[in-house]
Curated annotation (Swiss-Prot):
Pfam families: Methyltransf_7. Substrate binds at residues 16, 19-23, 141-145. Its EC number is 2.1.1.325. Keywords: Magnesium, Metal-binding, Methyltransferase, S-adenosyl-L-methionine, Transferase. This is Farnesoic acid carboxyl-O-methyltransferase. InterPro entries: MeTrfase_7 (IPR005299), MeTrfase_capping (IPR042086), SAM-dependent_MTases_sf (IPR029063). Belongs to the methyltransferase superfamily. SABATH family.
Length: 348
């Protein structure tokens, strides 16, 4: 991944581990549909007692443990119904970028787990496992990243220089460039997974996208990132961070709408879409709590802010973000909801 983007690691109060319950709740909400998909759509040769499972974009836990255990339980149930093989063993590959906090991940592995665990550092936009070695893959809240921000967007002298720190949707030219990069990257992700999966293997994607017609700046996520951008501008104006650095600081994030995401998968032709389900999130939309919202976006974006502007710059930024969130709660309450999804893909 040319643009590294990792969550804040560790087990402290500002870590992703402590502020990822919202993401983890989607796996729980989708559990019944995941079980159904594994039971009816997984079509692999049950002649071996070894099943390989991988989580692409695992972060530092604990959600990845919930996701892989859900898959293991579902596959085990299918084995019991369709095979006489006993003593099934599971190998789980935890993949994320090399900057991910694998130490925390492995330190907090469930002690009673009944699987072998391996860490696989590397960009999931390319192949990270041998060909035809994987039976079931999962990726949760990871397919909104791009491998790099289009260079024109970061160039202050470019006609399409983006004044925002992300693709807010306010400029059609910026959206076009981000979407172009997103198509390339998701296509690469899918092609790599298709090479790794055995014939009839499944890839399950969970995450959030925009309903058709909804722009990023109309969503809670878009509003919060806009608050981060405006807060950075304020402290740059105070001379606390470098303005030139800020002008080129763009997040490698693109939130697709549902039609864009479906079209990219269909155009890739490596998979059959077995299910494209809207999931009712157990926690609904984000809570209207400034402390919660600020912390949630600090653990996801704060690491990138700190890497460029220092820890002090990051802390000052998020003090302002919290103030803006409190002030703008009435507008946040009117934000348009996103769509939480489960996509089940079978390798062709």
């Amino acid at each position: 991944m040319s643009t590294s983007f990792t969550m804040i690691g560790g087990e402290g109060p500002n870590s992703y581990r402590e502020h990822s319950k919202y993401q983890g709740a989607l796996v729980i909400a989708a559990k019944e549909k995941i079980n159904e998909a594994i039971s009816t759509k997984l079509d692999i040769d049950f002649t071996s007692n070894l099943v390989n499972i991988a989580d692409f974009g695992c972060s530092s836990g604990p959600n990845t443990f919930t996701a892989v255990q859900t898959l293991i339980d579902a596959v085990e149930n299918k084995y019991k119904k369709e095979s006489n093989i006993e003593g099934i063993e599971f190998q789980v590959f935890f993949n994320d970028s090399s900057n991910n906090d694998f130490n925390t991940l492995f330190k907090t592995l469930p002690p009673a787990r009944l699987y072998f665990a391996s860490g696989v550092p590397g960009s999931f936009f390319g192949r990270v496992l041998p060909k035809n070695s994987l039976h079931v893959g999962v990726s949760s809240y990871s397919l909104h990243f791009v491998s790099k921000v289009p260079k024109e967007i970061k160039d202050r002298d470019s006609l399409v220089w983006n004044k925002d720190i992300h693709c807010s949707g306010s400029s059609k030219e910026v959206v076009k460039l981000y979407l172009g990069q997103y198509k390339i990257d998701v296509g690469s992700f899918l092609t790599a997974r298709a090479q790794e999966l055995v014939s009839g293997g499944l890839l399950l994607l969970l995450g959030s996208c925009r309903p058709t017609g909804v722009q990023m700046f109309e969503t809670v996520e878009g509003m919060m990132i806009d608050f981060i951008g405006s807060s950075l501008n304020e402290i740059a104006n105070q001379g606390l961070i470098d303005q030139q650095k800020l002008d080129t600081f763009k997040l490698p994030i693109y939130a697709p709408n549902v039609d864009e995401l479906k079209q990219i998968i269909e155009d890739n032709k490596c998979f059959t879409i077995e299910a494209f389900e809207k999931i009712s999130h157990a926690k609904g939309e984000y809570p209207l709590d400034p402390e919660y919202l600020t912390s949630a976006f600090k653990v996801t974006v704060g690491g990138s802010v700190a890497s460029l502007f220092g820890q002090d710059g990051m802390e000052k930024t998020y003090e302002l973000v919290k103030e803006k969130t409190q002030e703008m709660l009435p507008q946040i309450a009117k934000a348009k909801p996103g769509m939480q999804y489960l996509i089940v893909l079978r390798r062709n």
